[in-house]
Protein backbone atom coordinates (compact mmCIF):
# COMPACT_ATOMS: atom_id res chain seq x y z
CA UNK A 1 0.00 0.00 0.00
CA UNK A 2 1.63 3.21 -1.15
CA UNK A 3 -0.24 5.71 0.99
CA UNK A 4 -1.28 4.53 4.41
CA UNK A 5 -3.35 6.76 6.66
CA UNK A 6 -3.66 8.17 10.11
CA UNK A 7 -6.18 5.52 11.05
CA UNK A 8 -4.30 2.56 9.65
CA UNK A 9 -1.20 3.67 11.50
CA UNK A 10 -3.02 4.08 14.83
CA UNK A 11 -4.47 0.60 14.40
CA UNK A 12 -0.92 -0.67 14.26
CA UNK A 13 -0.46 0.45 17.83
CA UNK A 14 0.85 3.99 17.68
CA UNK A 15 -1.21 5.30 20.55
CA UNK A 16 -4.96 5.79 20.62
CA UNK A 17 -6.28 8.47 22.96
CA UNK A 18 -9.10 7.12 25.06
CA UNK A 19 -11.76 4.40 24.86
CA UNK A 20 -15.34 4.03 23.64
CA UNK A 21 -18.58 3.90 25.59
CA UNK A 22 -21.55 2.71 23.56
CA UNK A 23 -24.92 4.13 24.60
CA UNK A 24 -28.14 4.89 22.80
CA UNK A 25 -26.76 4.22 19.34
CA UNK A 26 -23.80 6.57 19.87
CA UNK A 27 -20.23 5.65 20.72
CA UNK A 28 -19.01 8.40 23.01
CA UNK A 29 -15.23 8.58 22.92
CA UNK A 30 -13.52 11.00 25.28
CA UNK A 31 -9.77 11.56 25.38
CA UNK A 32 -8.82 12.55 28.91
CA UNK A 33 -6.83 11.00 31.72
CA UNK A 34 -8.38 8.38 33.98
CA UNK A 35 -10.11 9.84 37.01
CA UNK A 36 -10.45 13.31 35.52
CA UNK A 37 -13.84 14.99 35.31
CA UNK A 38 -15.27 17.67 33.07
CA UNK A 39 -16.26 20.83 34.90
CA UNK A 40 -20.07 21.34 34.50
CA UNK A 41 -19.53 25.00 33.65
CA UNK A 42 -16.75 24.25 31.17
CA UNK A 43 -18.93 21.55 29.62
CA UNK A 44 -21.24 24.28 28.37
CA UNK A 45 -18.49 25.33 25.96
CA UNK A 46 -17.95 21.88 24.47
CA UNK A 47 -18.23 21.50 20.70
CA UNK A 48 -19.77 18.18 19.69
CA UNK A 49 -18.33 16.51 16.60
CA UNK A 50 -20.68 13.77 15.41
CA UNK A 51 -19.22 11.32 12.90
CA UNK A 52 -21.53 9.19 10.75
CA UNK A 53 -20.20 5.70 11.30
CA UNK A 54 -22.50 3.12 9.75
CA UNK A 55 -23.85 0.16 11.68
CA UNK A 56 -22.32 -1.12 14.95
CA UNK A 57 -19.68 -3.73 14.24
CA UNK A 58 -18.90 -2.38 10.78
CA UNK A 59 -15.37 -1.37 9.84
CA UNK A 60 -16.35 2.29 9.60
CA UNK A 61 -17.95 2.28 13.03
CA UNK A 62 -14.66 1.08 14.49
CA UNK A 63 -12.74 3.73 12.56
CA UNK A 64 -15.10 6.49 13.68
CA UNK A 65 -14.83 5.42 17.31
CA UNK A 66 -11.04 5.56 17.17
CA UNK A 67 -10.99 8.91 15.40
CA UNK A 68 -13.45 10.32 17.94
CA UNK A 69 -11.04 9.35 20.69
CA UNK A 70 -8.04 10.82 18.93
CA UNK A 71 -9.62 14.22 18.24
CA UNK A 72 -11.48 14.67 21.55
CA UNK A 73 -10.21 17.17 24.09
CA UNK A 74 -13.30 18.61 25.83
CA UNK A 75 -13.15 21.37 28.45
CA UNK A 76 -11.76 20.06 31.73
CA UNK A 77 -9.57 17.42 30.10
CA UNK A 78 -5.90 17.01 30.87
CA UNK A 79 -3.66 19.80 29.69
CA UNK A 80 -2.07 19.23 26.31
CA UNK A 81 1.72 19.17 26.27
CA UNK A 82 2.16 19.23 22.51
CA UNK A 83 0.44 20.74 19.48
CA UNK A 84 -2.30 18.39 18.32
CA UNK A 85 -1.10 15.59 20.61
CA UNK A 86 -4.18 15.80 22.83
CA UNK A 87 -6.89 16.25 20.25
CA UNK A 88 -8.78 19.40 19.31
CA UNK A 89 -9.31 21.84 22.16
CA UNK A 90 -12.96 22.00 23.24
CA UNK A 91 -14.03 19.16 20.92
CA UNK A 92 -15.93 16.02 21.95
CA UNK A 93 -16.01 13.31 19.29
CA UNK A 94 -19.06 11.09 18.87
CA UNK A 95 -19.29 8.04 16.61
CA UNK A 96 -22.93 8.11 15.49
CA UNK A 97 -24.61 5.00 14.08
CA UNK A 98 -26.28 5.32 10.69
CA UNK A 99 -28.15 2.85 8.50
CA UNK A 100 -25.58 2.95 5.69
CA UNK A 101 -23.21 5.37 3.91
CA UNK A 102 -26.05 7.07 2.06
CA UNK A 103 -27.73 7.77 5.40
CA UNK A 104 -24.42 9.15 6.70
CA UNK A 105 -24.12 11.54 3.75
CA UNK A 106 -27.74 12.67 3.90
CA UNK A 107 -27.44 13.27 7.66
CA UNK A 108 -24.31 15.31 6.99
CA UNK A 109 -26.15 17.23 4.29
CA UNK A 110 -29.04 17.83 6.70
CA UNK A 111 -26.62 19.10 9.38
CA UNK A 112 -27.44 16.40 11.94
CA UNK A 113 -23.82 15.24 11.63
CA UNK A 114 -20.57 17.20 11.43
CA UNK A 115 -18.66 14.52 9.51
CA UNK A 116 -18.96 11.03 8.06
CA UNK A 117 -16.71 8.16 7.05
CA UNK A 118 -17.46 6.73 3.62
CA UNK A 119 -15.55 5.09 0.81
CA UNK A 120 -14.30 7.38 -1.95
CA UNK A 121 -16.80 6.04 -4.47
CA UNK A 122 -19.70 7.00 -2.19
CA UNK A 123 -18.21 10.45 -1.62
CA UNK A 124 -17.82 10.91 -5.38
CA UNK A 125 -21.43 9.86 -6.04
CA UNK A 126 -22.65 12.29 -3.37
CA UNK A 127 -20.63 15.16 -4.82
CA UNK A 128 -21.90 14.46 -8.34
CA UNK A 129 -25.47 13.55 -7.36
CA UNK A 130 -25.33 10.16 -9.07
CA UNK A 131 -26.30 6.62 -8.07
CA UNK A 132 -28.09 6.57 -4.71
CA UNK A 133 -27.88 10.38 -4.55
CA UNK A 134 -29.57 11.06 -7.88
CA UNK A 135 -32.88 12.03 -6.25
CA UNK A 136 -31.33 14.27 -3.57
CA UNK A 137 -28.97 15.87 -6.06
CA UNK A 138 -25.29 16.86 -5.83
CA UNK A 139 -23.81 17.75 -2.45
CA UNK A 140 -21.56 20.43 -3.85
CA UNK A 141 -20.25 21.49 -0.45
CA UNK A 142 -18.84 18.06 0.43
CA UNK A 143 -15.18 18.26 1.45
CA UNK A 144 -12.47 15.75 2.38
CA UNK A 145 -10.60 16.10 5.66
CA UNK A 146 -8.31 13.06 5.57
CA UNK A 147 -8.12 9.55 4.16
CA UNK A 148 -8.65 7.10 7.01
CA UNK A 149 -7.79 3.76 5.45
CA UNK A 150 -8.75 1.62 2.51
CA UNK A 151 -11.08 -1.27 1.83
CA UNK A 152 -10.29 -4.12 -0.55
CA UNK A 153 -12.47 -6.18 -2.87
CA UNK A 154 -12.45 -9.84 -1.74
CA UNK A 155 -14.10 -12.26 -4.18
CA UNK A 156 -14.80 -15.67 -2.64
CA UNK A 157 -15.78 -18.86 -4.45
CA UNK A 158 -16.10 -22.43 -3.28
CA UNK A 159 -12.84 -24.36 -3.44
CA UNK A 160 -14.41 -26.73 -5.99
CA UNK A 161 -15.63 -23.88 -8.20
CA UNK A 162 -14.53 -24.02 -11.83
CA UNK A 163 -14.11 -20.23 -11.93
CA UNK A 164 -10.47 -19.43 -12.70
CA UNK A 165 -10.86 -15.66 -12.82
CA UNK A 166 -13.36 -12.87 -12.44
CA UNK A 167 -14.38 -13.10 -16.11
CA UNK A 168 -15.80 -16.54 -15.37
CA UNK A 169 -18.38 -14.94 -13.07
CA UNK A 170 -20.22 -13.18 -15.90
CA UNK A 171 -23.89 -14.16 -15.73
CA UNK A 172 -23.37 -15.85 -12.37
CA UNK A 173 -25.12 -15.33 -9.02
CA UNK A 174 -22.94 -13.11 -6.85
CA UNK A 175 -23.83 -12.21 -3.26
CA UNK A 176 -22.94 -8.55 -2.73
CA UNK A 177 -24.20 -8.02 0.82
CA UNK A 178 -27.35 -6.73 2.48
CA UNK A 179 -29.36 -4.43 0.20
CA UNK A 180 -28.22 -0.78 0.32
CA UNK A 181 -25.46 -1.63 2.78
CA UNK A 182 -21.96 -0.19 2.71
CA UNK A 183 -20.73 -3.50 1.28
CA UNK A 184 -23.39 -3.74 -1.45
CA UNK A 185 -22.95 -0.17 -2.69
CA UNK A 186 -19.16 -0.29 -2.93
CA UNK A 187 -19.12 -3.88 -4.21
CA UNK A 188 -21.13 -2.79 -7.25
CA UNK A 189 -18.67 0.03 -7.96
CA UNK A 190 -15.60 -2.19 -7.64
CA UNK A 191 -17.06 -5.05 -9.67
CA UNK A 192 -17.95 -2.55 -12.38
CA UNK A 193 -14.35 -1.31 -12.37
CA UNK A 194 -13.21 -4.91 -12.72
CA UNK A 195 -15.34 -5.38 -15.83
CA UNK A 196 -18.42 -6.88 -14.21
CA UNK A 197 -21.15 -4.22 -14.18
CA UNK A 198 -24.40 -5.12 -12.46
CA UNK A 199 -26.10 -5.89 -15.79
CA UNK A 200 -23.59 -8.70 -16.39
CA UNK A 201 -24.21 -10.52 -13.11
CA UNK A 202 -27.11 -11.75 -11.03
CA UNK A 203 -26.64 -9.70 -7.87
CA UNK A 204 -27.93 -11.40 -4.73
CA UNK A 205 -28.65 -9.47 -1.52
CA UNK A 206 -27.33 -11.65 1.28
CA UNK A 207 -25.33 -11.54 4.49
CA UNK A 208 -21.86 -13.06 4.31
CA UNK A 209 -22.66 -16.10 6.47
CA UNK A 210 -25.73 -17.00 4.43
CA UNK A 211 -23.86 -16.47 1.17
CA UNK A 212 -20.95 -18.62 2.35
CA UNK A 213 -23.34 -21.49 3.04
CA UNK A 214 -24.89 -20.95 -0.38
CA UNK A 215 -21.50 -21.31 -2.04
CA UNK A 216 -21.15 -24.81 -0.66
CA UNK A 217 -24.60 -25.89 -1.85
CA UNK A 218 -24.20 -24.29 -5.27
CA UNK A 219 -27.03 -21.80 -4.73
CA UNK A 220 -24.55 -18.93 -5.13
CA UNK A 221 -21.50 -18.79 -7.39
CA UNK A 222 -19.47 -16.15 -5.55
CA UNK A 223 -19.66 -13.74 -2.67
CA UNK A 224 -18.06 -10.32 -2.47
CA UNK A 225 -16.83 -8.70 0.71
CA UNK A 226 -15.40 -5.18 0.67
CA UNK A 227 -13.41 -4.93 3.86
CA UNK A 228 -10.14 -3.90 5.41
CA UNK A 229 -7.22 -6.25 4.99
CA UNK A 230 -6.94 -8.58 6.75
CA UNK A 231 -10.66 -9.20 7.08
CA UNK A 232 -11.75 -11.34 10.02
CA UNK A 233 -14.60 -12.85 8.03
CA UNK A 234 -12.41 -13.71 5.05
CA UNK A 235 -9.80 -15.18 7.38
CA UNK A 236 -12.39 -17.49 8.92
CA UNK A 237 -13.65 -18.64 5.52
CA UNK A 238 -10.15 -19.36 4.21
CA UNK A 239 -9.22 -21.19 7.41
CA UNK A 240 -12.10 -23.62 6.84
CA UNK A 241 -10.41 -24.92 3.69
CA UNK A 242 -13.69 -24.81 1.75
CA UNK A 243 -13.15 -21.57 -0.13
CA UNK A 244 -10.62 -19.66 -2.22
CA UNK A 245 -10.12 -16.10 -3.45
CA UNK A 246 -10.29 -14.89 -7.03
CA UNK A 247 -8.08 -12.03 -8.11
CA UNK A 248 -9.35 -8.83 -9.73
CA UNK A 249 -7.79 -5.90 -11.52
CA UNK A 250 -8.99 -2.65 -13.05
CA UNK A 251 -10.47 -3.14 -16.52
CA UNK A 252 -10.21 -0.40 -19.12
CA UNK A 253 -8.74 3.07 -18.76
CA UNK A 254 -11.75 5.14 -17.74
CA UNK A 255 -12.02 4.07 -14.10
CA UNK A 256 -12.21 6.74 -11.38
CA UNK A 257 -8.78 8.01 -10.35
CA UNK A 258 -9.33 7.08 -6.71
CA UNK A 259 -9.53 3.34 -7.42
CA UNK A 260 -6.27 1.43 -7.43
CA UNK A 261 -4.90 -2.09 -7.49
CA UNK A 262 -3.60 -3.71 -4.34
CA UNK A 263 -1.96 -7.04 -3.64
CA UNK A 264 -3.23 -9.35 -0.93
CA UNK A 265 0.12 -10.77 0.24
CA UNK A 266 0.71 -14.50 0.33
CA UNK A 267 -0.12 -15.81 3.78
CA UNK A 268 -2.34 -12.86 4.69
CA UNK A 269 -5.13 -15.43 4.82
CA UNK A 270 -4.68 -19.17 5.50
CA UNK A 271 -3.71 -21.04 2.35
CA UNK A 272 -4.00 -17.99 0.08
CA UNK A 273 -1.20 -17.09 -2.33
CA UNK A 274 -0.48 -13.52 -3.41
CA UNK A 275 -3.69 -12.24 -5.00
CA UNK A 276 -4.36 -9.06 -6.95
CA UNK A 277 -7.33 -6.99 -5.77
CA UNK A 278 -8.99 -3.61 -6.26
CA UNK A 279 -9.02 -1.12 -3.39
CA UNK A 280 -10.68 2.19 -2.62
CA UNK A 281 -9.79 4.76 0.07
CA UNK A 282 -12.05 5.45 3.03
CA UNK A 283 -12.48 9.17 3.66
CA UNK A 284 -13.47 11.40 6.56
CA UNK A 285 -15.69 14.00 4.93
CA UNK A 286 -17.42 17.14 6.19
CA UNK A 287 -19.27 20.14 4.82
CA UNK A 288 -17.40 23.14 3.46
CA UNK A 289 -18.77 25.22 6.34
CA UNK A 290 -16.83 23.20 8.94
CA UNK A 291 -14.94 25.91 10.88
CA UNK A 292 -11.38 26.23 9.67
CA UNK A 293 -9.87 25.85 13.13
CA UNK A 294 -11.64 22.51 13.58
CA UNK A 295 -10.53 21.18 10.17
CA UNK A 296 -6.98 22.28 10.98
CA UNK A 297 -7.16 20.72 14.44
CA UNK A 298 -8.48 17.41 13.13
CA UNK A 299 -5.56 17.03 10.74
CA UNK A 300 -3.01 17.94 13.41
CA UNK A 301 -4.53 15.55 15.96
CA UNK A 302 -4.53 12.66 13.50
CA UNK A 303 -1.03 13.57 12.30
CA UNK A 304 0.37 13.49 15.83
CA UNK A 305 -1.38 10.21 16.63
CA UNK A 306 0.27 8.71 13.55
CA UNK A 307 3.75 10.11 14.16
CA UNK A 308 4.83 9.63 17.79
CA UNK A 309 8.30 8.66 16.63
CA UNK A 310 8.38 10.97 13.57
CA UNK A 311 9.49 7.98 11.50
CA UNK A 312 9.53 7.99 7.72
CA UNK A 313 6.92 5.22 7.68
CA UNK A 314 4.59 7.13 9.95
CA UNK A 315 5.11 10.30 7.93
CA UNK A 316 4.00 8.54 4.79
CA UNK A 317 1.04 7.05 6.60
CA UNK A 318 -0.76 10.31 7.27
CA UNK A 319 -0.23 12.07 3.94
CA UNK A 320 -3.03 11.61 1.39
CA UNK A 321 -2.25 11.19 -2.30
CA UNK A 322 -3.61 13.93 -4.53
CA UNK A 323 -4.41 11.41 -7.25
CA UNK A 324 -6.82 9.52 -5.00
CA UNK A 325 -9.03 12.40 -3.94
CA UNK A 326 -12.67 11.93 -4.98
CA UNK A 327 -13.94 15.24 -3.54
CA UNK A 328 -12.25 18.63 -2.99
CA UNK A 329 -10.17 19.04 0.14
CA UNK A 330 -11.30 21.38 2.89
CA UNK A 331 -8.88 24.31 2.45
CA UNK A 332 -7.82 24.37 6.09
CA UNK A 333 -7.17 20.63 6.10
CA UNK A 334 -5.06 21.00 2.94
CA UNK A 335 -3.15 23.92 4.48
CA UNK A 336 -2.45 21.93 7.64
CA UNK A 337 -1.08 19.01 5.62
CA UNK A 338 1.13 21.36 3.62
CA UNK A 339 2.59 22.87 6.78
CA UNK A 340 3.07 19.54 8.55
CA UNK A 341 4.70 18.00 5.47
CA UNK A 342 7.56 20.48 5.82
CA UNK A 343 8.54 18.89 9.15
CA UNK A 344 8.20 15.27 8.05
CA UNK A 345 11.40 13.20 7.58
CA UNK A 346 10.43 11.99 4.11
CA UNK A 347 7.25 11.54 2.11
CA UNK A 348 7.90 9.18 -0.80
CA UNK A 349 5.14 8.73 -3.42
CA UNK A 350 2.79 11.23 -1.79
CA UNK A 351 1.90 14.91 -1.78
CA UNK A 352 0.01 17.39 0.32
CA UNK A 353 -3.53 17.75 -1.01
CA UNK A 354 -4.62 20.52 -3.33
CA UNK A 355 -7.98 21.27 -4.87
Where do the language-model regions lie?
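Pocket-flanking alpha-helical
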Residues: 81-135, 155, 209-215, 220, ...
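An extracytoplasmic/periplasmic, membrane-proximal ligand-sensing/linker region
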Residues: 206, 210, 227-236, 245, ...
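Pocket-lining segment of extracytoplasmic ligand-binding domains
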Residues: 120-122, 129-131, 161, 197-285, ...
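A structural signal for short loop-to-beta-strand junctions that line the ligand-binding cleft
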Residues: 134-148, 153, 268-276
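N-terminal hydrophobic or amphipathic helices and topogenic motifs
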Residues: 2-7, 13-94, 103, 140, ...
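Sec-exported extracytoplasmic/periplasmic mature domains
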Residues: 68-77, 109-113, 128, 192-196, ...
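Ligand-binding clefts/hinges and TM-proximal coupling segments of bilobed small-molecule sensing domains
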Residues: 171-189, 258-328
Amino acid sequence: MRALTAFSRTKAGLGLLGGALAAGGVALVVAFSAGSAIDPVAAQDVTYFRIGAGTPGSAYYGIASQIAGIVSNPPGSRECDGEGACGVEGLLGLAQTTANPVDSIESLRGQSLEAAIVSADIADAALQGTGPFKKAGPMVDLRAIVNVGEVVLHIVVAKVSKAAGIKDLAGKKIAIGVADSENALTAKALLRAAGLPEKKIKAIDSETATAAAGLLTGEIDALVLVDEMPSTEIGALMASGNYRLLGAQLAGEDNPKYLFEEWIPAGKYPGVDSTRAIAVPSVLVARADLPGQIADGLVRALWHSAMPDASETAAGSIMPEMSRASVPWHPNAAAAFTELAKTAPALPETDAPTN
